[in-house]
C-alpha cells in the first residue's frame, strides 16, 4: 500500500470543518499543529508593532494514494482556499515508507476497494 502526505495550512476557525470533510472523503486520521504562522505575497499587517495575522493550524493527513486527490479537493472546498486569498493552502507529497499504520491498513483496503 502506498501513501501520500497531505499538508494543510488553514485558518484555525476552519480546522474542524476541514478535518470533518477530509474524514468524510476517506482520511482515517490526522495530526494538528497549532499556532503556525506564515506569510504570502503581501507582508502581514501590524498595529503598533503587534501582528494582525490570523491564527493558523497545520493539519497532516497520511492517506492512501488512490484517495489522496479526492481528499485534497474536498479539503480545498471545505477551507475555501481558492475562493479568497489567505485562507489556506494544501499540498500532497509522496511518502516513501510509513510505520505505525498497520492497524489502519485493513480499513484503508476496504475503502480503496469500494472506490475502485
Model-derived segments and spans:
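Positively charged, small/polar-rich N-terminal and surface patches that mediate targeting and assembly
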Residues: 1-116
